[in-house]
Amino acid sequence: MGSSQSVEIPGGGTEGYHVLRVQENSPGHRAGLEPFFDFIVSINGSRLNKDNDTLKDLLKANVEKPVKMLIYSSKTLELREASVTPSNLWGGQGLLGVSIRFCSFDGANENVWHVLEVESNSPAALAGLRPHSDYIIGADTVMNESEDLFSLIETHEAKPLKLYVYNTDTDNCREVIITPNSAWGGEGSLGCGIGYGYLHRIPTRPFEEGKKISLPGQMTGTPITPLKDGFTEVQLSSVSPPSLSPPGTTGVEQSLSGLSISSAPPAVSNVLSTGVPTVPLLPPQVNQSLASMPPMNPATTLPSLMPLSAGLPSLPNLPSLSNFNLPAPHIMPGVGLPELGSPGLPPLPSLPPRNLPGIAPLPMLSDFLPSFPLVPEGSSAASAGEPLSSLPAMGPPSDPVMTTAKADASSLTVDVTSPASKVPTTVEDRVSDCTPAVEKPVSDADASEPS
């Protein structure tokens, strides 16, 4: 509901006689008075801004005579003028056949109780209250606060209670007779939820039944005309109006409109295999403009970058590896070669063990080959007696990535000298390494032999 009127009331103020109920075929019904939303603010130019007998006196003085009535609607926030003829002959109670109370516009809109969930077989359901669409707007007694309704329900326990209810679906007010009963079998005395406050007020402009809604495909080119209250109707449509764009963007939009999106995967260009970053292909005119640009040198344009030489620095000449001999394995005990396995080379076949008489059996070739260091490709002729110091110093390889270690069983020589020539040498070495015998001095007494 609106919080205040949008038009100025003649005579000022925000008070009037609130119409609560309109009887059928009454003078007020013929004048078009609407329950709950209409406020009688003046009759024949007399402002009704006080709760006194002015309204009764004016009606009694004009029985069976038409009078001009100024009415303010809190639904449309507008003033309208209506003609009504007070009468005692219409067949009901009162000269107008309406129930009224004096209050302010804002107070009437705030004192509304929203009917929420309604339990089945409850007093509210038996009285015909409708969930979410019914609003309790008053009773026979004045209710100005939220607790007034609950106090009224407690005082009418097991007694009929008349309530004025407005329904948003039918856009009409009606009388509801309800009998509060706390023993109905559920929660509360009414068996329904009640909402009160700003979020539970009656909408100012409820939806009009039978109103046509234009669909997106039914839009017309008719101009939009503002309403009387200053608001403009906006059609909720997915079709967007043409946007105002500067003349310079017309060509870009036309060129973009020619682009097509295809679900098929695009062909891979040869540029991907050359290491060039993959960037979107530019139109031909852009490529021509880029080709005419002079090359840029980062060293001259960026002061923080150091200039790089055209190529990598030359490496020193490496000695020829063809003269290198691989020492025999038994001369280098404890030195290991890494595993020669490579994804591109077949594995080395295993050799049978060779046991020579007089010496310890040699391990399998597959056992000690992985313990040797990786040696670059060299000659397969290896001298068993060549010392390690005779090997020339090797420089770093020209390309560490391309260096491969190729070793074969033929590049290794095993000393197969007869054991007869080797055993004495070994015995002599062992004798020479033995600790010399301790010499015992001989005295004169010991030197003479006993007789």
UniProtKB/Swiss-Prot annotation:
Residues 15-215 are annotated as: GRASP. It is found in: Golgi apparatus membrane; Endoplasmic reticulum membrane; Golgi apparatus. One of its GO terms (biological process) is organelle assembly. GO terms for cellular component: endoplasmic reticulum membrane; Golgi apparatus; Golgi membrane. Residues 236-252 have a biased composition (Low complexity). Detected in lung, heart and testis. Colocalized in a polarized fashion in the acrosome region with JAM3 in round spermatids (at protein level). Transmembrane segments: none annotated. It is a lipid-anchor. Residues 15-105, 111-199 form the PDZ GRASP-type domain. Residues 194-199 are annotated as: Important for membrane binding. The modification Phosphoserine is found at residues 214, 411, 443, 448. The modification Phosphothreonine is found at residues 222, 225, 417, 435. It holds the Pfam family GRASP55_65. A lipid is attached at residue 2 (N-myristoyl glycine). Keywords: Differentiation, Endoplasmic reticulum, Golgi apparatus, Lipoprotein, Membrane, Methylation, Myristate, Palmitate, Phosphoprotein, Repeat, Spermatogenesis. PROSITE patterns: PDZ_GRASP. The modification Dimethylated arginine is found at residues 30, 47. Residues 236-255, 377-451 are annotated as: Disordered. The keyword Manganese does not apply. Residues 410-424 have a biased composition (Polar residues). InterPro entries: GRASP55_65, GRASP_PDZ, PDZ_sf. Disruption phenotype: Mutant mice have normal weight at birth, but display growth retardation and lower body weight during postnatal development and in adulthood. Females display normal fertility. Males have normal mating behavior, but are infertile, due to defects in spermiogenesis and acrosome formation. Key structural protein of the Golgi apparatus. The membrane cisternae of the Golgi apparatus adhere to each other to form stacks, which are aligned side by side to form the Golgi ribbon. Acting in concert with GORASP1/GRASP65, is required for the formation and maintenance of the Golgi ribbon, and may be dispensable for the formation of stacks. However, other studies suggest that GORASP2 plays a role in assembly and membrane stacking of the Golgi cisternae, and in the process by which Golgi stacks reform after breakdown during mitosis and meiosis. Belongs to the GORASP family. Homodimer. Homooligomer. ER stress induces phosphorylation-dependent monomerization. Interacts with BLZF1/Golgin 45. Identified in a complex with RAB2 and GORASP2. Interacts with JAM2 and JAM3. Interacts with members of the p24 cargo receptors. Interacts with CNIH and the cytoplasmic domain of transmembrane TGFA, prior its transit in the trans-Golgi. Interacts with KCTD5. Interacts with TMED2 and TMED3. Interacts with SEC16A in response to ER stress. Interacts (via PDZ GRASP-type 1 domain) with core-glycosylated CFTR in response to ER stress. This is Golgi reassembly-stacking protein 2. It comes from Mus musculus (Mouse).
